[in-house]
Amino acid sequence: MKGVAWILSVGNELLIGRVVNTNAAWLASKLTFLGYSVRRIVVVPDEENDIVEAFREAINRADVVILTGGLGPTPDDITNLAFCKALGVEAVVNDEALKMVRGKYESRGYALTPERIKMAMMPPGATPLPNPVGTAPGILYESGGKLVVLLPGVPKEMEAIFENHVEPLLKSRGPPVYFSEREVVVRGVPEADIAPVIREVMRLDKRVYVKSHPRGFEVNAPLLHIHIYASAGSKEEAEALVSKASDRLIELIKLKYGDRASISTG
């Protein structure tokens, strides 16, 4: 399987700022460490047309699509149905998924209402993913070399399903890419002055990426956390790239700014 991934997040609450999109950040980190290149994080409202459009574009441009949100029983939970529309197929009740949903509710004395049955609807041929924390199953769908995964929006549910079922699959099929990172903390040098140094370090190898994150005041008390990461075909090679970039970064900062710069690594 190729390594381009998109993350889709569904929910009005994300777009109005009521909820911070921690799911996307968590998934992006997971996918990156698995060797996938996350090229887009897209947030859409609980509107069918928007979800359909996002799905179609993602499936067309990515190898792996991970979506969170909109799998529950409420009227605005329509992600699974919109996914079917994006594929041009009729949503069907998956027998295995229905057993999962029924078991969750009937064990607590709740009836299996149409709203709850909706959580078991998915495209023909899709695989339901057990939810050990909540009630809505995840959905895994493969076609034409593409892998699409739909997960609940509740973080604990999303994380549990991903780690139990999705991560092992992606790890087994993912590109042979390893990831390494390091942080260098620099005090006393403004970000604008560090920028040329970072550009020079990044010229060492196209697999190395360096990004500065200011934490202090640019003029009065500059404080930078500089994140260095690299990907390579082996763990040792990735670590060597990061080590070389880190050493060169520190060397250049000391050369240019001397005692003015206070440097530490983490």
From Swiss-Prot:
It comes from the Archaea. SUPFAM superfamilies: Molybdenum cofactor biosynthesis proteins. It holds the Pfam family MoCF_biosynth. Signal peptide: none annotated. Belongs to the CinA family. This is Protein PAE0875.
